[in-house]
Amino acid sequence: MSELNKIALKILSNGKGILAADESNGTMTKRLESVNIQSSPENRLLFRETLFEADSMRDCIGGVILYDETINQISNDGKTIPSLISDTGAIPGIKVDTGAKNLANSSEEKVTEGLDGLRERLKRYYQLGARFTKWRGVYNITENYPSKLAINSNAHALARYSALVQEGGMVPIVEPEVLMDGEHSAEDCLIKTSEVIKKCFEELIIHKIDLSGVCLLYTSPSPRD
């Protein structure tokens, strides 16, 4: 069993889940200000510390996805945030993409960016304690979308990301998210989602990814009104 496979299995062991605590500062600001709390680095840290120190963390959470700000912070008792998470038995992870941008020659669709400088960032995240990462591709469903261009572009980016992550000794979470917005049927969503995931794995294989050290995160097909 490879070390990457051991990490992947530990994240999902005993029916545990992954806590997504990788909200951007903008998203955290909206959440905190909605309850009249100032969105300062200290308050964002306190919010996340409250999650990580909950009694149910040890029993329910196998991995925690962090935001760049958070993985660099120190808890109120002097521990690094990754150490605080590791003490619960969970594995620290980090979101590494830099967001979805308009896809050239198909402006209604998105392609996720963040490959530039990723190898260097991954080295730093590993030193900080991260052992898995996340990258999210986004796809719209309409009569004409997702296009082959969007499917291929995002699959290629996910594979290149995965190769760099495994090179750095971490497990990549591959998230090809087919958005639920629209008027599509469950059947249409199933067809599009299957096409997206199939292409992702074709690219992962081309890039010689160790599939036993990959976690797939996807949206279950569903109809929308």
Indicate residue ranges for each PLM-predicted region:
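Non-cysteine beta-strand/loop elements that form the S-adenosyl-L-methionine
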Residues: G93-K95, T133-V138, V214-C215
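Alpha/beta enzyme core
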Residues: K123-L128, Y161, E167-G168, I191-S212
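Glycine-rich, proline-tolerant flexible connector loops at the mouths of alpha/beta enzymes
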Residues: T70-N72, G137-K148, D181-E183
